[in-house]
Amino acid sequence: LHLCDRRQRQMCIRDSHNKTDAAKCDVKKAYPSTTVECVMNLLRRDIGKNKPLLWLVEAVMANYPDGVLLIGGYLPCWLFNYVMSYVLRYILSHRKVRRGKSSKMILAICCYADDITVYGRISNLTKVMKDTTRWAKETLGLTIKSAWDIIHFASFDAERQQNKRRKAGSHQRTPGLDMMGYVVRRTYTIIRGRNFVKLRRAILRAQRDLDALGYVPWWRAQRIMSQWGEIKHSDSRGFCQKYNIYKIIRAAKRSVSWHSKQLLLKEQAHGAVC
């Protein structure tokens, strides 16, 4: 399965100096659409000689209601990834021949669960996704939604010009890929809009608590620390300087550490009494 983190998504966009587009789509009702019969057919094809393993997997899935994968299970998660790997390999297998030379139609793929992002030229992407939608439905029983998000990434020069306009007061941005909590563009990455609004609100309230109480309540500190990774892995230096993020993060870490120690002491005291 071609999983793709933030850095890999950036590389797909930035390493290609030519015109690059992206098509983002997802599978409709991914787990309920993946049948036990489909999974077993693929497993028999790939590991047909391993009879004990086939028997075990089939016995476990025999309890699944309606004969489809369960949502939230550990085994269904990996089995769905296994089925999706066939879709991704089929997408990457598309090639075209021009002047006797064969070339790839797809530049790269990023996949997160049932969300698929395909990179390449828009003319190639349209052909590949239409063919893949038909193949996935006929072969695997999966329905890829027809409502694709098409992103036309701006060039490096267009990004620089837009950056100058933003410094002059404009609030517009160039098109970006919104996936996994980030919006990725050729020259920078930011946090998704609604996630940023929630984070900024929590930061402001934490600063107010820090000024009034001298500490950040543990429950608010946990909420902030859960989004600390989004700040670290995005271009948020101006945000950190404006709102004194590093000071608040240090206070949040102390609060979370203190709360964890209190819980540990309670567990030890309860164990001693018992």
Regions of interest found by a model, annotated:
Residues 3-5, 144, 179, 265:
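Generic detector of low-complexity/intrinsically disordered segments
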Residues 1-15:
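Single conserved hydrophobic/aromatic residue that forms the stacking wall/gate
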Residues 1, 67, 73, 178, ...:
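Flexible, active-site-adjacent loop/turn segments at secondary-structure boundaries
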Residues 2-5, 31, 112, 182:
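Aromatic side chains
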Residues 168-274:
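Active-site and adjacent loop segments of nucleotide-processing enzymes
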Residues 14-113, 117-132, 137, 144, ...:
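Conserved polymerase palm-domain catalytic core
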Residues 108-111, 118-211:
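Polymerase palm active-site segment centered on the conserved acidic dipeptide of motif C
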Residues 2-4, 57, 93, 264:
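Compositionally biased amphipathic helical and low-complexity segments enriched in hydrophobic
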